[in-house]
């Protein structure tokens, strides 16, 4: 039961930190970006980038629009 309390307390602390104006841990940053297939699906100052997983474990990967400089 103490492990459950620990998880709940940590979750509440993270939630409080995220709600402080000007402070963000970017926990939801990727989900706020829209998905894309090519750079044409993104704004002019964004690029379509493959995110998620790593070399040893590809896991779940998706393409999202992130800020970049395209010329």
From Swiss-Prot:
Propeptide residue intervals: 21-29
GO cellular component, one term: extracellular region
Keywords (A to Z) from UniProt: Cleavage on pair of basic residues, Disulfide bond, Knottin, Neurotoxin, Secreted, Signal, Toxin
Keyword Disulfide bond part of the UniProt annotation: yes
UniProt subcellular location: Secreted
GO MF annotations in UniProt: toxin activity
Expression (tissue specificity): Expressed by the venom duct.
Disulphides: 36-48, 42-65, 47-68
Signal peptide region: 1-20
Protein role: Elicits an uncoordinated twisting syndrome when injected into C.elegans, but has no effect on mice.
Record comment regarding domains: The presence of a 'disulfide through disulfide knot' structurally defines this protein as a knottin. The cysteine framework is VI/VII (C-C-CC-C-C).
Protein name: Augerpeptide-s7a
